[in-house]
Structure formats: structure tokens, C-alpha cells
């Protein structure tokens, strides 16, 4: 069973082709016809499986940062740089005023998932560890893993530069061997990059870089807006380092769900019209940044972000 947006409602939209409607229309569909399901957190969800992909243009420095509510951009950037650094310590984010991992890194939560021997904040071999040290033996968040495991992120960058038509430009956070060691298995778990080569009649133009990300568990209220912005930013970062043009970010979802206690706040969000997406500029040049590890929070300059106000939703851990 599917629910469609009627023509009358579409005609009332001032900008019916705005890419944010992909997100809003999926939320409406889930609320209307989704399957009511129990879940790990005890909150309960309304869910659909494998909805159509979202596609967001990254051309002309566009950043698909949702506008029908304010997205915590500073938190998105800090978390992304935390991933890139390979860090697995939630306290490193907390010290920057970003508490999005505090619930999963609390002593109470770690004990609940059988990891009570870890110190508070030690999340185990989560995203950043897999990106930079896949296959290395994890000890704790304070270990020195330099040169250990597979640096997938650097391999992605090297392959884009040296073999751009490769069909194996993959970044995976899903490592079955390490799942029992993680405070929370990865939700956004896998992505593939694709380089479109310059056309024959324009050999001097830059190749175009796109990213497809698969997300197994998709919290539409809180997580997905964050994840869209994060992987769009990652694509922009890699494009700068590899001298390619950011082109498109595609999100394919598995279990796409709305938590039961998010339904009413999201109905408020559905009443809002999307505004123009902002633009991303770099405060420093490619030469000044140097490599993927050279980015700083201050390098991300987002211009023209004029969202609607914040909508509070509780996180289920």
C-alpha cells in the first residue's frame, strides 16, 4: 500500500521541485501507511522498508542542509571530523559541546549492552575506527592505532585520484567481527563513490564526484537530517582534496522509521515550506588544508542558511 501526495497539495507548493520534499513526503507516507513496530529502545516506531532513494545535488557548492527545522550544523561538522580522525571517544565530542553520543557512551548504557568494563565514553570500534583502521584489533578508545588496519578513507581518496573509474571505491563501517564490541552498530554503514569523467568535448573540465550511502536504520526525525548533511560534507571534502567537482549525494534507506514520540513534532515540520539550501565555501585553500586530516571546524563556511526554527525531539538510545 502506498500513499501519494495529491495534485492539489503539490500545486500549493511555492517550489514543488525542492529536493527537501523527498524527505517531507517520505515522513508523511510513513506516518500515514507505515507499519507500527516494536523496537530495541522500547519507544516503538512506524516504519517502511527500502523507500525510493533520496537524491541531492551538490553542484555549485550546494549543501543539502534541511531547512524545515534548524539542523545542528556545528554538531554535524564536529562529528564528521571526529569520524575522519578515527576517534571513538564520545568525550572528545562532549568537550566541544556536542553531546550527541553521550547517551550511548554513558556507563549505564555500556553496562546494559555488556560493555561495562569500558570507561565512560569508550564507544568501541565504531565509525571512525572502521574508516581508518579496518581489521585492526581494538583495545580501547585510548589505544594508538597508527599504521594498523586498513585506512579505507585514504584508499578512497587515492583511488579517486589514480583510478577514478574503479567500481570498488568503497567505505564500509560494517565489520561483523567487531559488532559485539560496539556500543551501537553503525546505522549509516556503507558508501560508494563514483567519478564522472569530463565529456570528450570538454576535456579541461573537472571530473564530478558522487556518493551513494546505504543506511540500514534511518531515524527520520533526528538522524537522517544529520546524516544527509554529514555525507554531503564528506563528499565536498573529498572533492576538494581530489580536485573533483561535488556532484550528487544519494541516500538509500533500509528500515526507514519515525519514532512514535516524534509523530506530532514531525507533523509540525510537515506544515513548513522548504527554503533554499545554503552554500558551502572553504576558509582555506586545498593547498593550505593539505590532506583529509587537515580539515578544521573553522574551514567550513556555510552561507545562506535560513531555516525554520528548531523542533525538539527526544533521542531514543
Swiss-Prot record:
InterPro entries: Thymidate_synth/dCMP_Mease (IPR045097), Thymidate_synth/dCMP_Mease_dom (IPR023451), Thymidate_synth/dCMP_Mease_sf (IPR036926), Thymidylate_synthase (IPR000398), Thymidylate_synthase_AS (IPR020940). The keyword Cell inner membrane does not apply. GO terms for molecular function: thymidylate synthase activity. The keyword Transferase applies. Keywords: Methyltransferase, Nucleotide biosynthesis, Transferase. (6R)-5,10-methylene-5,6,7,8-tetrahydrofolate binds at residue 219. CDD domains: TS_Pyrimidine_HMase. One of its GO terms (cellular component) is cytosol. DUMP binds at residues 40, 167-168, 216-219, 227, 257-259. Its EC number is 2.1.1.45. It comes from the Eukaryota. Pfam families: Thymidylat_synt. It catalyses: dUMP + (6R)-5,10-methylene-5,6,7,8-tetrahydrofolate = 7,8-dihydrofolate + dTMP. The active site is at residue 187. One of its GO terms (biological process) is dTMP biosynthetic process. Pathway: Pyrimidine metabolism; dTTP biosynthesis. Belongs to the thymidylate synthase family. Homodimer. This is Thymidylate synthase. The gene is TMP1.
Amino acid at each position: 500500500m502506498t500513499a501519494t501526495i495529491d495534485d492539489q497539495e503539490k500545486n500549493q507548493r511555492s517550489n514543488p521541485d525542492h529536493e527537501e520534499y523527498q524527505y517531507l513526503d517520505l515522513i508523511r507516507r510513513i506516518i500515514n501507511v507505515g507499519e507500527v513496530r516494536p523496537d530495541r529502545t522500547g519507544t516503538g516506531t512506524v516504519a517502511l522498508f527500502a523507500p525510493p532513494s533520496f537524491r541531492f545535488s551538490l553542484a555549485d557548492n550546494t549543501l543539502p542542509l534541511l531547512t524545515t527545522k534548524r539542523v545542528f550544523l556545528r554538531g554535524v561538522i564536529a562529528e564528521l571530523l571526529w569520524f575522519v580522525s578515527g576517534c571513538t571517544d564520545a568525550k572528545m565530542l562532549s568537550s566541544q559541546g556536542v553531546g550527541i553520543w553521550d547517551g550511548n557512551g554513558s556507563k549505564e548504557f555500556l553496562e546494559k549492552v555488556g560493555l561495562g568494563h569500558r570507561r565512560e565514553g569508550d564507544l568501541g570500534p565504531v565509525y571512525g575506527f572502521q574508516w581508518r583502521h579496518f581489521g585492526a584489533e581494538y583495545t580501547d578508545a585510548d589505544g594508538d592505532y597508527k599504521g594498523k588496519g586498513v585506512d579505507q578513507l585514504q584508499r578512497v581518496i587515492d583511488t579517486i585520484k589514480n583510478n577514478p573509474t574503479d567500481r570498488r571505491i568503497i567505505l564500509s563501517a560494517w565489520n561483523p567481527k567487531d559488532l559485539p564490541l560496539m556500543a551501537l552498530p553503525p546505522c549509516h554503514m556503507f558508501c560508494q563513490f563514483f567519478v564522472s569523467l569530463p565529456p570528450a568535448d570538454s576535456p579541461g573540465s573537472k571530473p564530478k564526484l558522487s556518493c551513494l550511502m546505504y543506511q540500514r536504520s534511518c531515524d527520520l526525525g533526528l538522524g537522517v537530517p544529520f546524516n544527509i548533511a554529514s555525507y554531503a560534507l564528506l563528499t565536498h571534502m573529498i572533492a576538494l582534496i581530489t580536485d573533483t567537482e561535488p556532484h550528487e549525494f544519494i541516500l538509500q534507506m533500509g528500515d526507514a522509521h519515525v519514532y512514535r514520540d516524534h509523530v506530532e513534532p514531525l507533523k509540525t515540520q510537515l506544515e513548513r515550506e522548504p527554503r533554499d539550501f545554503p552554500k558551502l565555501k572553504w576558509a582555506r585553500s586545498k593547498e593550505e588544508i593539505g590532506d583529509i586530516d587537515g580539515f578544521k571546524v573553522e574551514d567550513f563556511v556555510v552561507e545562506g542558511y535560513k531555516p525554520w526554527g528548531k523542533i525538539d525531539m527526544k533521542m531514543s538510545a
